[in-house]
A protein has these predicted regions:
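Short S/T/G/P-rich N-terminal loop/turn motif that feeds into the first structured element of a domain
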Residues: 1-58, 63-77, 84-166, 172-184, ...
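Accessory, usually C-terminal, subdomains that scaffold auxiliary metal cofactors
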Residues: 192-193
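C-terminal structured interaction module
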Residues: 196-197
Length: 206
């Protein structure tokens, strides 16, 4: 299944354009993101999160699913028609996954977006690791993940579409404290020796 990650930056220019043209923004949103448009191109939201509260460089992150590449291309043409890039400063990644998203059932989740960079140093460390060492490391990760009550929502391979990133995904935590505990465990495991990642916390947008 095809997924698109959209990461919206807090850009003073585009923020000003949005503030000065609310009617045009509304029309563009209806054209690009209405239920009718989504139904036409087979688009569905997976997550749509506010992130400014945790990192003021970024306003929002969202992941959509598409039925196929032609559907993504057709929807992208609508996005261009709406001149959407005048108002939103975006980083986008495409990825694929064989699994359906698994949204958490607990209330008020904290979502963590992660984007795994293609980093030669971490790739070299992974290459030196034996299968036994890798299995032991992931077992520790799994123990921490379960202990704090986290849930894996989605992971997508994206290297085929953008060689800067190997993949992206989303984890869900029941609280900020749970995320802090998991991050502490990762530091103690020296996890950053094996993966270089950009991460961002968000809460579901109402």
């Amino acid at each position: 299944m095809l997924y698109t990650l959209c990461l919206a930056r807090n850009n003073p220019y585009t923020n000003t354009e949005m503030a000065h043209r609310p009617n045009e923004i509304g029309k563009g949103w209806d054209l690009v993101f209405s239920e009718e448009t989504f139904a036409q191109y087979g688009v569905k939201w997976v997550v749509y999160c506010d992130a400014t509260w945790s990192n003021e460089e970024y306003a929002v992150f969202a992941i959509n699913t598409y039925k196929d590449i032609p559907a993504r291309l057709a929807h992208w043409k609508e996005i261009e028609k709406a001149a959407w890039y005048q108002y939103i400063d975006l980083l986008t990644l495409m990825g694929t996954s064989d699994q359906e998203p698994q949204l958490p059932t607990f209330p008020n989740p904290i979502f963590q977006l992660f984007m795994i960079r293609n980093d030669p140093a971490t790739a070299a460390n992974l290459a030196r690791e034996t299968k036994e060492e890798e299995a032991a490391r992931w077992a520790k990760w799994e123990e921490s993940y379960k202990r704090v009550g986290a849930r894996s929502v989605l992971y997508c391979d994206s290297y085929w579409a953008n060689e800067d990133y190997l993949g992206f995904g989303v984890l869900a935590f029941p609280s900020v404290e749970a995320r802090q505990a998991h991050a502490k465990d990762l530091l103690e495991m020296h996890w950053n020796q094996y993966y270089s990642a950009f991460t961002l916390l968000g809460i579901p947008r109402a």
